[in-house]
C-alpha cells in the first residue's frame, strides 16, 4: 500500500540504510551504486541536564533543537522532549546531499534535516510520521521555521504563490498525477486524471498503490480538454496542476484558484518538473524529488556509458508509433529522447509538434530496424505484425516489434516511471550490453517511489519481451 501521512513510510520501517531486498547492490554496472556515507552536521548534539519521562529519547543537532521541540510539543502538547547526547531512540541531524543513489529516503522535516530512527519504537515511528505530515509541516510554519507561502516558477514561466501546507489538489494531467504520487503528495488529491488506469490491470495496480483511487479518478471531469467548473468549485482545491497544452486555462482562471503548468517533453524538463512537484508539498516531497532525479541521472549515465561509443551507422533505427500504427512520435516528444538515450535513432525525429499522422509509404522509406508501440489507446503489436502491408519492413521481418511496458503509468511518457522505460528499451536495442537489469530496477523503483512491493511474477511479466 502507498505511504500515507498518518503512518511511518515503509522505507523507514525497515531501516534508513536498509533496502537490500529491493535496492540493487553496487557490484556491477547493471546495479545501482550504494549511497555515499551520510555526513552529519558538525554541530554538537544538545542534551538536557536530566532525562525526563518521555516516550523516546532523541539526539539533536544544536541548530535543530528549536524545530524538534516545536514538532514534539505539537505532537505531545504537555510533554517535554528527552534530549540526550548518545544512544538515543531518534537521531535528529542535518545531512549532506547524497552523491550516489540513496538506498532509502529518510524523513526530511526541514531542507537538509532528517529524522533517523535508531530503534524499533512505535512511538518514534508515529512521531516521525507526524513530523513529515501536513500537521507537522503546519507546526513548523507556526513556529516560523517553514514558509507559509512558497513561490514557484512553473514550466510556462509563470510565478505562482502557493499557501503552505497544501491540503487539496486537482491534477488534470496524467503524467503530473504520477509525479504527485512519486513525491508522496497523493494525500492532497481531491480528483485526478490518471495515465494507464483505464484497463483492468492498470486499475487493479493503481488500487493496490492507493485504495482511494476509484474515488479520485476524475477523467470525466478533468483532463487536458475537459474542465468541469462546477465540480472544481465544489472541491475547492488549493491548487490545480495541468499541462501547458491544456485548452481550458481561461475557464479555470474564473475560479481564482492558482494553477501550475507542466511541459516535460525532454529529460531535463522532466527532472525540472519533478523538482517543481516536490517544491509544492514541502521538505519531505522535495527530498523524494531530489532522490528521483539522482536515480534518473544514474540510469541515463549507466546506459550512455554503454551506448555513447557506438558508431552512428551501428545504431538501430527506431519508429515509435502512437494509438494508431500510422501515428508517430515527433522529435519534440519525450519518446524521441528515450530512443536516443537507449542508443537508437528515431526515424521520425525530424518531425515537429506532437503526434504526426503519416502514410505507409513514408514508414517504408524509413524502414526502421525496430518498432515500438505504446501500452495505451488500444495499440497492439499484432496490428502491425499481422497486417500484410507491413511485411515489407525490416522490423516486422526480423521480429523486432515491441510493446512498451507499464504497471499503471506507461513507461514511455514524461513521468517518473519512464526511468524504467529507458532500461527496457536499451535491453531491446542492445541485449548484449551490460545495462541495468529491468526486473531489479522495477522492484527498486516501485518500492522506493510508490512504496509498492510489486509481486515478482508481475514485474517479470512487465519486463519480458512481449
Task: Please name every model-derived segment.
Residues 171, 177-235, 239-245:
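A short, structured surface patch at a secondary-structure boundary
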Residues 47-148:
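Exported/periplasmic ABC-transporter solute-binding proteins
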Residues 61-80, 134, 178-187, 196-207, ...:
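Short, polar/charged alpha-helical segment
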Residues 44-57, 76, 158-165, 183, ...:
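Immediate post-signal peptide segment of exported/extracytoplasmic ligand-binding proteins
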Residues 122-126, 146-152, 159, 248-327, ...:
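Extracytoplasmic substrate-binding proteins
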Residues 328-355:
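Alpha-helical, coiled-coil/dimerization segments enriched in small aliphatic residues
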Residues 52-62, 80-83, 150-151, 167-170, ...:
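Short, well-ordered beta-strand elements
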Amino acid at each position: 500500500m502507498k505511504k500515507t501521512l498518518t503512518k511511518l513510510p515503509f522505507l523507514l520501517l525497515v531501516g534508513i540504510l536498509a533496502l537490500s531486498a529491493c535496492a540493487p547492490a553496487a557490484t556491477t554496472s547493471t546495479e545501482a551504486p550504494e549511497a555515499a556515507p551520510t555526513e552529519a552536521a558538525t554541530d554538537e548534539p544538545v542534551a538536557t541536564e536530566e532525562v525526563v519521562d518521555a516516550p523516546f529519547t532523541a539526539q539533536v543537532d544544536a541548530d535543530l533543537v528549536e524545530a524538534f521541540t516545536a514538532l514534539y510539543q505539537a505532537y505531545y502538547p504537555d510533554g517535554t522532549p528527552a534530549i540526550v547526547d548518545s544512544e538515543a531512540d531518534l537521531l535528529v541531524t542535518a545531512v549532506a546531499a547524497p552523491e550516489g543513489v540513496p538506498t532509502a529516503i529518510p524523513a526530511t522535516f526541514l531542507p537538509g534535516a532528517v529524522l533517523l530512527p535508531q530503534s524499533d519504537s512505535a512511538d518514534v515511528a508515529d512521531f516521525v510520521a507526524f513530523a513529515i505530515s501536513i500537521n507537522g509541516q503546519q507546526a513548523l510554519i507556526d513556529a516560523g521555521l517553514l514558509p507559509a507561502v512558497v513561490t514557484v516558477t512553473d514550466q510556462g514561466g509563470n510565478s505562482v504563490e502557493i499557501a503552505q501546507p497544501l491540503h487539496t489538489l486537482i491534477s488534470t494531467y496524467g503524467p503530473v498525477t504520477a509525479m504527485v504520487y512519486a513525491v508522496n503528495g497523493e494525500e492532497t488529491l481531491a480528483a485526478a486524471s490518471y495515465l494507464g488506469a483505464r484497463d483492468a490491470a492498470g486499475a487493479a495496480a493503481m488500487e493496490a498503490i492507493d485504495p482511494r483511487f476509484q474515488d479520485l479518478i476524475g477523467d470525466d471531469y478533468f483532463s487536458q480538454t475537459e474542465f468541469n467548473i462546477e465540480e472544481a468549485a465544489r472541491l475547492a482545491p488549493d491548487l490545480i496542476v495541468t499541462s501547458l497544452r491544456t485548452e481550458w486555462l481561461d475557464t479555470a482562471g474564473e475560479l481564482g484558484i492558482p494553477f501550475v503548468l507542466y511541459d516535460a517533453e525532454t529529460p531535463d524538463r522532466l527532472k525540472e518538473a519533478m523538482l517543481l512537484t516536490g517544491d509544492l508539498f514541502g521538505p519531505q516531497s522535495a527530498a523524494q524529488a531530489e532522490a528521483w532525479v539522482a536515480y534518473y541521472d544514474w540510469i541515463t549515465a549507466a546506459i550512455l556509458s554503454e551506448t555513447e561509443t557506438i558508431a552512428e551507422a551501428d545504431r538501430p533505427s527506431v519508429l515509435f508509433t502512437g494509438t494508431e500504427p500510422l501515428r508517430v512520435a515527433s522529435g519534440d516528444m519525450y519518446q524521441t529522447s528515450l530512443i536516443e538515450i537507449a542508443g537508437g535513432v528515431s526515424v521520425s525525429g525530424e518531425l515537429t509538434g506532437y503526434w504526426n499522422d503519416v502514410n505507409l509509404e513514408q514508414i517504408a522509406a524509413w524502414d526502421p530496424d525496430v518498432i515500438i508501440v505504446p501500452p495505451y489507446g488500444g495499440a497492439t503489436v499484432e496490428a502491425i505484425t499481422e497486417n500484410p502491408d507491413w511485411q515489407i519492413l525490416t522490423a516486422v521481418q526480423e521480429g523486432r516489434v515491441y510493446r512498451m511496458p507499464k504497471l499503471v503509468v506507461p513507461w514511455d511518457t514524461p513521468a517518473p516511471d519512464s526511468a524504467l522505460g529507458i532500461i527496457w528499451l536499451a535491453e531491446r536495442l542492445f541485449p548484449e550490453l551490460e545495462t541495468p537489469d529491468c526486473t531489479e530496477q522495477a522492484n527498486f523503483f516501485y518500492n522506493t517511489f510508490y512504496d509498492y512491493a510489486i509481486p515478482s511474477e508481475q514485474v517479470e511479466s512487465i519486463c519480458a519481451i512481449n
